[in-house]
């Protein structure tokens, strides 16, 4: 369950669209094909988010996300995230993602712009990561 959520810009003459960003979100079962996700899933039972247990059934994995450099800082990221949130919130109350701890730009974007909460810190294959969670009932658009 999930999908690719795409942000597009329509040309002034409405004749074409240009992809300016995307976000991927899906069930843990979908992401299980990549080794980091079963590793993260195994850690969930020891974690909670805002007093709620995080499980495979009540959470999903969000990311990666990318916004074209020419459109960064223009509000595309929160609007793209909000589109994803609306597409996933009826099935999952909690979203989970991870960010490399060596990527302060992504950390800032997710914690400050979107209000995500760090719930875990871990290493996988020698790389340090934050695990973050977010409440799917809460809009990021204010």
Residues covered by each model-derived region:
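C-terminal "cap" of GNAT-fold acetyltransferases
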Residues: 123-142
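Conserved beta-hairpin
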Residues: 2-23, 38-41
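Conserved beta-strand-loop-alpha-helix junction that forms the acyl-donor binding cleft
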Residues: 63-72, 97-107
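Conserved GNAT acetyl-CoA-binding A-motif
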Residues: 58-62, 88-101
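Short hydrophobic/aromatic beta-strand element in the GNAT-like acyltransferase core
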Residues: 2-6, 22, 59, 64, ...
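Conserved active-site alpha-helix within GNAT-family acetyltransferase domains
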Residues: 78, 101-120
């Amino acid at each position: 369950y999930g999908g690719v959520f795409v942000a597009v810009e329509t040309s002034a003459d409405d004749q074409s669209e240009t992809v300016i960003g995307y976000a991927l979100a899906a069930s843990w079962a979908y992401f299980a094909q990549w080794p980091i996700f079963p590793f993260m899933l195994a850690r969930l039972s020891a974690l909670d988010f805002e007093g709620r247990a995080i499980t495979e059934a009540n959470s999903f994995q969000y990311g990666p996300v990318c916004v074209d450099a020419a459109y960064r800082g223009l509000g595309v990221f929160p609007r793209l995230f909000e589109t994803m949130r609306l597409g996933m919130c009826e099935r999952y109350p909690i979203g989970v993602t991870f960010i490399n701890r060596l990527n302060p730009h992504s950390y800032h974007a997710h914690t400050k712009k979107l209000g995500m909460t760090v719930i875990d810190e871990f290493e996988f294959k020698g790389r340090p990561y934050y695990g973050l969670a977010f409440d799917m009932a809460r809009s990021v658009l204010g």
